Amino acid sequence: RKNLGSFMFNGEDVFKKINVLSGGEKVRLELCKILKKNPNLLILDEPTAVLTPQEINELMQIIRNLTKEGKSVIIITHKLKEIKAVADNCTIIRRGKYIDTVLVEKTTEDDLASMMVGREVNFKVDKEDAKPKETILEIKNLNARDTRNVQILNNLSLEVKAGEILGIAGIDGNGQSELVEILTGLKKADSGSITINGNEILNDKPLNIFNKGIKNIPEDRHKRGLVLDFTIAENTVLQRYKEPTFSKNGVLNNEAIEKHAKSIVEEFDVRPTDYTVKSRALSGGNQQKVIIGREVDNIRVDKAKTNQPQLLIATQPTRGLDVGAIEFVHKALIEQRDEGNGVLLV
């Protein structure tokens, strides 16, 4: 309690299991462990990647306090507001090369972004007004419990129309993850109704839900989006490898898979362009491009087959990405909306 007291843990929290701590609590706990050794230099690598806005503000204040106490802090981040909030100097590295070191107070966010990406970055998403059409996803009176058997979704109802992006906002732990798991078939609901293009999918199998029109950019690209030890090419056909285009009699058609991967790599500017590289070797932004490219391609294929709009679920799609990759993700979601599909943005 003594060690954790200054990091906003109350007395009861010290008895919590680690697996139930929030992202912010885990980061603060790691800081406590480090600071107990009284280091002179702290290196924080993307410390806010899984934090809420409130937790980020709290961490920024902790960092300020540490520097006032004479500690030196190196914070590795791509988030411009965090650089402006706590850094005195900023060194920019792009593709493994040193670009420049600047005084933060004399450098604008636009200048930092340009140095990071190597070009001018558009922070404003250019988009026309939405033109919503028919309802493609309808949820009625959905009820579900979390892993602690606590009611997490309580008579939830919503609709997503073709040609619109519906956003779901809220702090982590308020049912968003459970909703997405239910929509993709990874979790069972207690009751309610979910239809996609008029087809009931409540508690259906994941592959059936996928085939009926729901595609997913998951929150955790490492656990749910990619098989990290598979190549880029193999990851582009995760849901479709059994189709005749990509396999015959249980044997994969590597030539067809690689041709398919090449088109995705080129269209979505995945780097490196070598689709035989394991996905583990890619940066976070390029891993996300592989996932988005795969799901957009899945949407095109199934839309052509069924002549029905598809639903793309995107959960925290820009988490952990640099400003250039964030710009790419925003444009990709807008394009899906403009092509007449629905987007559920969590």
Region locations from a protein language model:
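Glycine-rich phosphate-binding loops of nucleotide-dependent enzymes
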Residues: 45-346
